[in-house]
């Protein structure tokens, strides 16, 4: 759940460590460093508690990884593999909240792990306050703030910050790739791409290129090869 300076709420308890002289484990993300402190990050006690906490998170998470957009690039999946979690000792209890699949931003409540990153990034960075906690107890999850009737009638600017900072696949952009291929296959359609400046940088970063690298020519060439008729900056 940790995001430096933005989300330091110690919610997930995955970063627990053992401090010499203390009987209880503490969260590394919220415990101040002190002089002469001795910290054990991988003791048997730490490993056992960390494993249990991840198992509890997984018990409220839809683990259909093969059909998830974040498969292979998922913080929770990586944690589960690192901790050797291949079976769950707890019964599944997953909250499923309906969502408008036509909206460009798609939320899957079945995958939400209640890290609250989306809430904090939207509140503290974007200042839009779109997300909030709903329900109580074990049914607590994240949904559109009750200030808005629904996501379509909210102040969401579709900036994508909540998607970028979600550690799992609970938030994603609507996939319009099938519609694009359908248009490209139609010989009666003239297809035009207009590229926004921000896309150039984001596209390069996704390929592992440095932000200052010039990727516009590569992008134009790729789009033309895919089959678009015209590409404009």
State where each predicted segment sits.
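Beta-rich nucleic-acid/ligand-interaction surfaces
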Residues: 8-10
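Serine/threonine-rich, repeat-prone extracellular segments and beta-strand-based repeat modules
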Residues: 2-6
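Flanking helices and flexible, charged tails adjoining ferredoxin-like Fe-S electron-transfer domains
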Residues: 143-233
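Fe-S ferredoxin-like electron-transfer domains
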Residues: 13-158, 164, 171-172, 176-183, ...
């Amino acid at each position: 759940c940790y995001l430096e300076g933005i989300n330091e709420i110690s919610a997930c308890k995955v970063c627990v460590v053992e401090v010499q002289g203390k009987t209880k484990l503490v969260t590394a993300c919220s415990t101040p460093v002190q002089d002469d402190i001795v910290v054990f990050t991988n003791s048997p006690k730490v490993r056992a508690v960390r494993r249990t906490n991840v198992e509890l998170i997984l018990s409220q998470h839809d683990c259909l990884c093969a059909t998830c957009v974040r498969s292979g690039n998922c913080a929770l999946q990586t944690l589960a593999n690192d901790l050797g979690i291949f079976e769950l000792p707890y019964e599944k209890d997953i909250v499923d909240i309906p969502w408008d699949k036509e909206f460009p931003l798609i939320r899957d409540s079945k995958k939400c792990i209640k890290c609250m990153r989306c809430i904090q990034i939207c509140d503290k960075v974007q200042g839009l306050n779109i997300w909030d906690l709903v329900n109580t107890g074990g049914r607590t999850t994240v949904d559109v703030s009750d200030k808005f009737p629904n996501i379509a009638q909210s102040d969401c600017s579709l900036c994508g910050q909540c998607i970028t900072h979600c550690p799992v696949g609970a938030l994603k952009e609507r996939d319009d790739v099938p519609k694009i291929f359908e248009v490209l296959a139609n010989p009666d359609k003239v297809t035009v791409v207009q590229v926004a400046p921000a896309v150039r940088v984001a596209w390069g970063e996704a390929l592992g290129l440095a932000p200052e690298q010039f990727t516009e020519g590569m992008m134009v060439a790729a789009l033309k090869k895919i089959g678009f008729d015209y590409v404009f900056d």
